[in-house]
UniProtKB/Swiss-Prot annotation:
This is Tryptophan synthase alpha chain. GO terms for cellular component: cytosol. Pathway: Amino-acid biosynthesis; L-tryptophan biosynthesis; L-tryptophan from chorismate: step 5/5. Its EC number is 4.2.1.20. It comes from Burkholderia lata (strain ATCC 17760 / DSM 23089 / LMG 22485 / NCIMB 9086 / R18194 / 383). The keyword Lyase applies. The active site is at E49 (proton acceptor), D60 (proton acceptor). GO terms for molecular function: tryptophan synthase activity. The alpha subunit is responsible for the aldol cleavage of indoleglycerol phosphate to indole and glyceraldehyde 3-phosphate.
Amino acid sequence: MNRIQQTFAALAEQGRKGLIPFITAGDPDPAKTVEFMHALAEGGADVIELGVPFSDPMADGPVIQRSSERALARGVTLKSVLADVKRFRETDPKTPVVLMGYANPIERMGVDTFAAEAQAAGVDGVLVVDYPPEEAGVFAEKMRAAQIDPIFLLAPTSTDERIADVGKIASGYVYYVSLKGVTGAGNLDVSSIAGKIPAIKSRVPVPVGVGFGIRDAETARAVAEVSDAVVIGSRLVQLLESAAPEGAAAALKTFIAELRAALDGAGKTAR
């Protein structure tokens, strides 16, 4: 088993739910990214999603769009993000890291080159927002050949056919987008999520993480009751946007620890 599979197997054995925080690499300061990754892990993150900044992040709301713009303005590239993962791996060989972003930077690097360099850096999974499953078969095969999990999005609008397509090629976990629209938008309806998850789990043989719109421990706990993992991004990016630079890592760790405690409560309830 790879790191993602080991992590979810351990969570299932313990009756706990996964916590998957997202931050944008290089924001607000490229020199702080690895420190922030360690803060997430120390706070209780099970998997870290590291955003690769892109100039046209179509699935992201204004918070993460601003974050991408700041990172790009500071010279962050896919190559520098891979270097961050490699540095993180020097002192954390355990916490899975998933790169989340768009196809263009990967295609510019070359898929084969990306697969080799991501594997060498210690990347465990990759979620490419604009690779639909019906067009991603070759990409998924190349990722798996490099021991990298190809991770896919599902949404409230996903048809049974789309869910089945994802089930055929996904590994690691799938990311269920709990709201229509862009990241950070709207209010969650947990009962609606609960109604969708069984249909996904019946067709997809990997854990289901739920994200978009999760902003606090209470919401995270409610979502954890009906999913395998909770993904939180925009709220963390906002936290880093507003925190004093010297206290940002500590604030991140504290917030993640609060979410971890809430999810562990959900896990106990679910057993």
